[in-house]
């Protein structure tokens, strides 16, 4: 090889290294499908003392996808997509009462608990927005609000007195009323 050819080849090799030009041994890119994941929320412990978890956007989204679990018991009846179970069992865990519990105690139609921490109607309206509805109430001095992710008789309800939440029910409920 003459000197000119060597200079040209070494210059091309150097330029290729500097600018990243070269052969690749990688395989060409392939389109891959990725599974969509639904938001999931799990709560453990006493809920009444820490009821502000119901304002968390992850919790609210879990209601939309029937992926909420409380103290190891799944509440899969928040959207109306799943049919209400036929079980009549009840279980009490911490400060919560579960109704419609299956025989394995892994699933329930609803859960209810009294709220002892501060949770206001204003906070509910900010978190749930237009999805929050005022329900008719027969008890003087109390009001009930509910949110139904699937616009059916499922979701979450809040019993209030003096604009403070006193009780929360999650799961199967009768939701009617006016939207805000």
Model-based region annotation:
Residues 1-32:
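Sec-dependent N-terminal signal peptides of Gram-positive bacterial secreted proteins and lipoproteins
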Residues 71, 78, 114-116, 148-150, ...:
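A structural detector for beta-sheet-dominated domains
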Residues 106-108, 143, 165-166:
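Hydrophobic residues embedded in beta-strands of well-ordered beta-sheets
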Residues 110, 153-155, 165:
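Extracellular structured ligand-interaction cores
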């Amino acid at each position: 090889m003459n000197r000119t050819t060597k200079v040209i080849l070494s210059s091309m090799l150097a330029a290729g290294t500097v600018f990243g030009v070269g052969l690749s041994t990688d395989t060409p890119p392939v389109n891959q499908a990725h599974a969509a994941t639904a938001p999931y929320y799990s709560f453990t412990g006493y809920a009444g003392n820490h009821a502000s978890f119901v304002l968390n956007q992850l919790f609210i989204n879990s209601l939309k996808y029937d992926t909420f679990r409380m103290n190891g018991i799944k509440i899969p009846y928040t959207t109306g997509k799943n049919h209400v179970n036929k079980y009549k069992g009840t279980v009490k865990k911490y400060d919560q009462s579960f109704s419609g519990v299956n025989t394995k105690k892994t699933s329930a139609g609803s859960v209810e608990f009294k709220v002892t921490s501060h949770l206001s109607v204003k906070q509910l309206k900010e978190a749930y927005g237009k999805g929050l509805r005022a329900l008719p109430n027969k008890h003087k001095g109390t009001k009930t609000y509910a949110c139904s992710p699937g616009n059916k008789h499922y979701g979450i309800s809040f019993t209030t007195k003096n604009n403070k939440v006193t009780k929360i029910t999650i799961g199967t409920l009768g939701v009617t009323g006016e939207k805000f």
